[in-house]
């Protein structure tokens, strides 16, 4: 798996992403950002219990959810509401957005928004997460095969060291282009003798950027006392429904402090990127930009003046 410094820029990083489906971006977050963000989310993690939220034990999906969430894993979501560093710095990461535009924007109707964000903390004694594709969230894409454009991509940044022993994400580079419909209908990828995974070993601030088609899963934590903590930020095509219902869960007071682009990532704007001369067709109020309808102020974001 290739490792490229963030300073290499989006072109080099995206080329490796297209080839392997995954790449380690070294120094994606600064040490200062890691420290300040970690401090802001610590109270929420302290209050959180490990494992999946309470559910109907008779539900067919209960066991699957327990395995995916992890019985000794904490998952803290809704980070926009918990961290100013997240909403004003991490969600505004310029390299990240340059890569997202390369992944999702091929024509004037294309765009993207945030699917979900969470801090994932794998405790000692945790079992490995089942190998899966994030694209399983959107079954039509999964069934259509590898030729489909990306539905979802993920950035997982290390907040603590990721090692082979403490639960570094296990990944299978190249599996974004070799799957079949039969494999997609069989969740037991662990039984595939041809599947080779490697641990995404990272220092704090490093990030794995990967396709929703890549097979991966959280590793087992075999240490006695090391918590493996990471930040996952996933993004989807704007025509798809996100996991987190941000327009119904993020307060207007918080949204008013954010940039136009940040608001668009949460669904408080009709589209991102904004392309001059292209009208709004999705997520509108009678064809008008939804943010203007609800009274959000126009702002400048990056090189786009709105």
Curated annotation (Swiss-Prot):
Keyword terms of this UniProt record: Dioxygenase, Iron, Metal-binding, Oxidoreductase
- Which positions does the site annotation Important for reaction specificity cover? 234
**Reaction catalysed by this enzyme:** (1S,4S)-4-[(4-methoxyphenyl)methyl]-2-methyl-2,5-diazaspiro[bicyclo[3.2.1]octane-6,1'-cyclohexan]-4'-one + 2-oxoglutarate + O2 = (2S)-3-(4-methoxyphenyl)-2-[(3S)-3-(methylamino)-8-oxo-1-azaspiro[4.5]decan-1-yl]propanal + succinate + CO2
Repressor recorded as keyword: no
Pathway in which the depicted protein is active: Secondary metabolite biosynthesis
Q: Which GO terms describe its molecular function?
A: dioxygenase activity
Out of the domains of life, which is the source?
Eukaryota
State which residue ranges cross the membrane: none
Residues bound to Fe cation = 132, 134, 216
EC number annotated for this UniProt entry: 1.14.11.-
InterPro entries, alphabetized: Phytyl_CoA_dOase-like (IPR008775)
| Family statement | Belongs to the PhyH family.
This chain's protein is named Dioxygenase FrzG
